[in-house]
Structures are given as structure tokens and as C-alpha cells.
């Protein structure tokens, strides 16, 4: 765990806390607006949160070679999260346009 400086750990851990906060606030906002299409964003955010956990786990164990699979997992999760975020935006946009037509 001594490989990274305290400031780098601060950035990594604040990123994880940031994802938890955005997921929580999006859950509240979804309940407030009663719009189910917003829940697709939460799925994408959760995948990004898991990606951040991969980075923290790898660094926590001093980048040991046994945990190098986490690098590929983090890359895949980031890609998958970005793709799901794109489709979440499309779903939400479609929902907005549908509501405007009524």
C-alpha cells in the first residue's frame, strides 16, 4: 500500500466516494421525478463504481502481478459503463421526446 502517495490515495478514494454519492443522489432524483428511464443511468454509474474499485484494489496490494487481471477488468468495465451511459442517454432522450408529443 506504500507505492502511492497520500495525495494519490486521496484522489482514488474520493473518486469511489463520488460514485457512491452520484448513485445515491440519482436514486433520490429518480424517486422524486418518478421517471423510470432515469434508472438506466444508475446501472451505468454502478459499473463505473466497480471500475474505480478495481483500481483501488490493485493499488492496495502494491500492484502485485497476481492482481494484474484487474487492469483488464477495469478497462472492460470502463468501456462497458461508457456504452451503457450512451444508451441511457438515448433512452432518456426518447422518453423526453415521447412526453413532449403528448
Swiss-Prot record:
Its main location: plastid. The chain crosses the membrane at residues 9-29, 41-61, 71-91. InterPro entries: Uncharacterised_Ycf49. One of its GO terms (cellular component) is cyanelle membrane. Keywords: Cyanelle, Membrane, Plastid, Transmembrane, Transmembrane helix. It is found in: Plastid, Cyanelle membrane. It is a multi-pass membrane protein. It holds the Pfam family DUF2499. Belongs to the ycf49 family. This is Uncharacterized protein ycf49. The lineage of its organism: Eukaryota, Glaucocystophyceae, Cyanophoraceae, Cyanophora.
Amino acid at each position: 500500500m506504500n507505492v502511492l502517495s497520500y495525495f494519490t490515495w486521496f484522489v482514488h478514494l474520493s473518486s469511489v466516494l463520488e460514485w457512491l454519492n452520484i448513485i445515491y443522489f440519482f436514486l433520490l432524483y429518480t424517486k422524486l421525478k418518478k421517471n423510470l428511464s432515469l434508472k438506466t443511468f444508475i446501472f451505468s454509474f454502478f459499473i463505473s463504481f466497480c471500475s474505480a474499485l478495481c483500481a483501488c484494489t490493485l493499488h492496495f496490494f502494491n500492484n502485485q502481478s497476481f492482481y494484474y487481471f484487474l487492469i483488464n477488468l477495469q478497462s472492460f468495465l470502463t468501456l462497458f459503463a461508457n456504452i451503457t451511459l450512451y444508451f441511457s442517454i438515448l433512452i432518456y432522450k426518447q422518453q423526453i421526446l415521447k412526453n413532449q408529443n403528448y
